């Protein structure tokens, strides 16, 4: 008996392993015939995940052959393709209509609005109604900042904050370009901490299977630098967030399968960013939640997709009280609410790069870091490839996952592992020089950001002279960078100024004579990568 999984990338590996554990033969489809998970499958077909009819024909051949137990995906945009095939073949899943509601953001927002589920005000734009007058009208109605997204994409691709009319038009153009349907959605900005929540919907029950705090940084983009599982929350806030997620899932029509929410807790209570009809990507459903809870969420989701009872889910879940906020105080409970709670803490953190061309990728020290479970570099980050400071979550360079009984230990382990990664860049390249010289696009004010706050011209003038050839940089940290303001400040790699100096001394014990002001200015702009780049460019 076969299980058909859409996608053959890293995010689908937990599903492949879980299906095999359940005794099924695993068949994969993906447009990329070099995808990394293909070798783990029993059969692979090169089919674009957008091609519903092509997937359906392949699924029919499996069903008519040795049998097809389920069609499944996790961490892709294509839950609607899953539901389309399942509905045609009478297999368990969300309905195709519900899956479309959970895939197309304008449909999603309308469902929320019709059901009075708290979510931002929105407008739809495409190339036909995209005019300056329309942009002015929208901005006058919801004000700045606002958010622009493609209606049908994930990974924050084409998604950004818009802070002025100058930024509005370029943002909409990009969102329309990366949208599969050529549509963008404009929303009011929601201010508040953001959470990712996974759940399984089954027989009128809604069981939360992962509740994480997302660490979103670097406006105008929404870059997830990591997440921590579980989130630490007041019980009432916790229950309100779950209750509003459940109301949103019900409004979309999700009844049989997985659901995943990105949701904020604003000054007015929970508001939904979006809900997908699938398990989350971003290492949550397949890594941090199973680690922290001891529950194989993917396996339980697959059991539902196979029409079987998710026994471990039912055995370990606890009741959650339905609790509404002022924005939906008259709402009726949509499902019976449960949660399988995390027992430990798992932290995921990402590492990133400043712009340039990769010359080396290495760990600064070979010392094993306690509590680190996974070290996951992106396959796209290799010698001679271009890297950039991320504008979406696909452009990050890698991820680390830790697990510990204690929150502080888990977080510190992940951060220490990230700080131990070094991506060296080719010397004297335009992209890196432009970054160090603060060149930015007109519609990206102050982006990419700096690693540390800049010195004033008077403070910079205090840094004089040269750092002698082959001398330890740690012995030449300027006094202006030893103040309390800089001692505890860390960059995106979780390094302080003194950390950077010590790591430079490990990476480049032999270096040329360096202009001190130029060197430390580069450190403030781009951290350790910039320090090594400046040194290498002087040779």
What are these regions (language model features)?
Residues 1-98, 128-130, 309, 316-336, ...:
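ATP-binding N-terminal substructure of ATP-dependent carboxylate-amine bond-forming enzymes
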Residues 240-261, 267, 276-359:
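Active-site "cap" helix and flanking loop/linker of ATP-utilizing ligase/carboxylase catalytic domains
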């Amino acid at each position: 008996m076969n299980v058909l999984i859409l996608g053959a990338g890293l995010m689908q590996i937990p599903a492949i392993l879980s299906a095999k554990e359940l005794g099924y033969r695993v068949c994969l489809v993906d447009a990329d015939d070099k995808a990394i998970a293909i070798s783990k499958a029993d059969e692979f077909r090169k089919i674009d995940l957008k091609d519903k009819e092509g997937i359906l024909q392949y699924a029919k051949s499996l069903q008519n052959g040795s049998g097809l137990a389920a069609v499944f995906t996790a961490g892709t945009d294509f839950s609607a393709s899953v539901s389309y095939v399942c509905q045609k073949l009478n297999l368990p899943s969300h309905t195709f209509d519900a899956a479309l509601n959970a895939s197309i953001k304008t449909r999603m927002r309308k469902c929320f609005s019709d059901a009075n589920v708290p979510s931002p005000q929105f407008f739809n734009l495409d190339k036909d109604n995209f005019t300056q007058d329309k942009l002015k009208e929208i901005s006058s109605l919801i004000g700045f900042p606002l958010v622009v997204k493609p209606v049908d994409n994930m990974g924050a691709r084409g998604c950004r904050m818009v802070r002025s009319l100058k930024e509005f038009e370029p943002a909409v153009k990009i969102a329309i370009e990366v949208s599969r349907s050529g549509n963008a959605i404009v929303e009011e900005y929601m201010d508040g901490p953001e959470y990712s929540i996974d759940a399984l919907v089954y027989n009128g029950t809604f069981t939360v299977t992962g509740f994480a705090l997302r660490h979103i940084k670097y406006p105008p983009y929404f870059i997830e630098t990591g997440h921590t599982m579980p989130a630490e929350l007041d019980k009432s806030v916790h229950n309100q967030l779950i209750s509003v997620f459940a109301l949103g899932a019900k409004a979309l029509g999700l009844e049989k399968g997985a659901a995943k929410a990105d949701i904020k807790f604003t000054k007015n209570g929970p508001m939904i960013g979006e809900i997908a009809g699938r398990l989350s990507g971003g290492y949550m459903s397949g890594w941090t939640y199973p680690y922290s809870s001891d529950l194989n969420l993917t396996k339980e989701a697959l059991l539902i997709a196979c029409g079987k009872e998710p026994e471990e889910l039912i055995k370990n879940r606890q009741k959650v009280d339905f609790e509404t906020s002022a924005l939906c105080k008259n709402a009726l409970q949509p499902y019976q609410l449960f949660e399988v709670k995390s027992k430990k803490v798992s932290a995921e953190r990402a590492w990133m790069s400043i712009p340039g061309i990769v010359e080396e990728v290495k760990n600064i020290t070979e010392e094993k870091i306690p509590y680190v479970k996974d070290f996951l570099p992106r396959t796209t980050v290799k010698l001679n490839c271009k890297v950039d400071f991320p504008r979406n979550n696909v452009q990050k360079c890698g991820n680390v996952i830790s697990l510990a009984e204690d929150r502080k230990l888990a977080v510190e382990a992940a951060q220490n592992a990230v700080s131990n990664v070094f991506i060296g860049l080719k010397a004297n390249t335009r992209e890196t020089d432009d970054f160090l010289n603060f060149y930015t696009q007109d519609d990206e004010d102050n982006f990419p950001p700096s690693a540390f706050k800049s010195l004033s011209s008077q403070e910079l003038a205090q840094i004089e002279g040269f750092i002698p050839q082959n001398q330890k940089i740690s012995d030449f940290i300027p006094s202006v960078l030893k103040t309390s303001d800089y001692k505890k400040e860390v960059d995106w790699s979780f390094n302080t100024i003194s950390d950077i100096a010590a790591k430079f001394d490990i990476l480049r014990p032999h270096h040329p004579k360096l202009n001190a002001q130029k060197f430390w200015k580069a450190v403030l702009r781009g951290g350790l990568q910039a320090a090594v780049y400046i040194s290498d460019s002087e040779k």
